[in-house]
Regions:
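DNA major-groove recognition helix of helix-turn-helix
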Residues: 10, 35, 42, 46, ...
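DNA major-groove recognition helix of helix-turn-helix/homeodomain DNA-binding modules
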Residues: 45-60
Length: 70
């Protein structure tokens, strides 16, 4: 299972979803979906924007855990 960790970066930077939306041009509902892990897909360009803004690696934004029994 792939999980987004964007909400952790927002907390580290003391930034709101609205502020992130304003800084990146990414719609706030999209950012909310990333933070709530409810997006069905992740836009590669968004990852690039987040990594540049937060000066981090993709691994800091996404986590992969195998499902039980695999």
């Amino acid at each position: 299972m792939i999980k987004m960790k964007l909400h952790i970066k927002l907390a580290e930077f003391r930034m709101t979803q609205k502020e992130l939306s304003e800084k990146t041009g990414i719609r706030q509902p999209t950012i909310s979906a990333y933070c709530n892990d409810s997006n069905k897909h992740i836009v590669k360009e968004h990852l690039d924007i987040f990594c540049e803004l937060f000066n981090c690696n993709v691994e800091d934004l996404i986590e992969y855990n195998k499902k039980d029994g695999q």
